[in-house]
A protein has these predicted regions:
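N-terminal cap/lid segment of alpha/beta-hydrolase-fold proteins
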Residues: 40-105
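Short beta-strand/loop motif that positions the catalytic acidic residue
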Residues: 306-308, 312
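Short substrate-entry loop that stabilizes the transition state in hydrolases
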Residues: 104-108, 117-156
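Alpha/beta-hydrolase active-site loop
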Residues: 166-188
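C-terminal catalytic histidine-bearing segment of alpha/beta-hydrolase fold enzymes
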Residues: 321-324, 328-385
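Primarily recognizes the serine-hydrolase "nucleophile elbow" in alpha/beta-hydrolase
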Residues: 186-187, 192-241
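Mobile cap/lid helix-loop segments that gate and shape the active-site cleft of serine hydrolases
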Residues: 124, 231-296
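Short, low-complexity N-terminal tether/leader segments at secretion or assembly junctions of large
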Residues: 1-35
């Protein structure tokens, strides 16, 4: 069993002398994990073992993965030996935030994949995850948090300066998350099973991780999630992104046919949406059947809980409601909490929680304001530890 106590240069000492450790050699940090060292008590032993913690503990680690951005859709008339797959490697950025309690050996740390929304990115030197309340709260309570951009920067430039924020949960994004997950498992001391949290456009990313990857997921949470490539991204994208926004990313990544004489400069008028080319990466069309009773039945491989505001005009709540109901119809574990008001800012609905269950001091030493959806996400994950 391990007890994290603080910085120490002390050598192992008998248990009877724990209270006599030279205070000049120990900087005690009470009731708060630290990234410096820990003392572990071996069963049936009268020795205190002092070990130095990982240099990654309490740090933000940046990394890259290589993504093959060659087109993936194969037309029916190209299934013969004449068709050759291609390799077009691009670099995508990743971020990994370690809790103070992380160690290179011994007890494993739980990893959370936190997929950024359409207002954030992961770059060479920054990420949305570092500033989100849920990421900071999870890290403060012993979780590691990982994200990637999901749309390689140079690829976005080569395709006409696509919005870097819009990974749209595509097969390119799935490659990036799979490779980032494998990187984390191969190089760090993490449990293989992860939690997922996605905010806004991060909702379609995390949902496609569940539907299209081998990553083992304990549970998924989503705030105001995007779930429908056609109705939410193509027909009704966020108001400020109708031109060269997520629709343009869909068109370029999936190879939509261009319109010869577009009716407007809007993305939805410049290309022809093709559900077949989406190849199942539209969650609303994936893994769902309609029963004789007219109801939709969706088999989903992990528990899921979404939060959404009914007056959200950026990402409508109705697809979220339909998605959750289809999982419930099939006997799955799925929950939806709806707020009457709050718009697209689910994260800020309600008064701060007066007595959060977890530690609220972030890795930078600041106090985290915990709103209801943040606390409820934390508690939801705790159910499946």
């Amino acid at each position: 069993m391990s007890k994290i106590i603080g910085r120490t240069t002390a050598t192992p000492v008998p248990r009877s002398d724990w209270n006599q450790i030279d205070e000049t050699k120990v900087d005690f940090i009470k009731n708060k994990p630290t990234n410096i060292a820990f003392i572990s008590e071996e069963d049936n032993e009268d020795i205190v073992v002092v070990e130095t913690a990982s240099p990654y503990a309490g740090t933000i680690h940046r990394f890259t993965v290589e993504v093959n951005c060659a087109p993936m859709y194969i037309p029916e008339d190209n299934l013969g030996p004449e068709f050759n797959d291609d390799y077009q490697p691009y670099t995508d950025y990743g971020v990994l935030i370690f809790p103070d309690s992380y160690t290179d050996k011994g007890n494993k740390t739980r990893l959370v994949i936190s997929a950024h929304g359409g207002g954030g990115t992961v770059s060479a030197d920054s990420s949305q995850a570092e500033f989100q309340s849920i990421s900071r709260y999870l890290v403060a309570n012993g979780y590691a948090v990982m994200d990637v951009n999901g749309l390689p920067e140079q690829y976005a430039i080569d395709k006409g300066n696509l919005r870097l924020q819009d990974s749209v949960g595509s097969y390119l994004a799935m490659q990036s998350y799979i490779k980032a997950y494998n990187y984390c498992m191969e190089n760090f001391n993490f449990h293989p099973e992860v939690f997922l949290v996605g905010i806004s456009e991060g909702g379609i990313t995390t949902t496609n991780i569940v539907l299209h990857t081998h990553i083992p997921v304990l549970a998924q949470a989503g705030w105001s999630p995007v779930l429908d490539t056609y109705n939410q991204i193509w027909l009704d994208p966020w108001p400020w992104c109708s031109v060269n926004g997520p629709g343009a990313v869909l068109a370029n990544v999936y190879g939509f046919e261009p319109v010869e004489s577009p009716a407007s400069t809007k993305d939805r008028d410049k290309w022809i949406y093709d559900e077949k080319k989406i190849m199942g990466y539209n969650p609303m069309k994936c893994n769902v059947t309609t029963g004789a009773d007219g109801l939709e039945y969706r088999h989903y491989r992990c528990p899921v809980k979404f939060w959404h505001c009914m007056d959200d005009e950026t990402v409508r709540y109705e697809p979220t409601e339909a998605f959750i109901k289809s999982i419930q119809n099939a006997g799955g574990t799925a929950y939806l909490k709806l707020y009457e008001t709050g718009g697209h800012e689910t994260a800020y609905v309600g008064d701060p929680v007066p007595n959060p269950l977890g530690n609220t001091i972030a890795y930078d030493g600041t106090e985290i304001e915990i709103k209801p959806v943040c606390e409820e996400t934390f508690l939801f994950f705790k159910r499946f530890e």
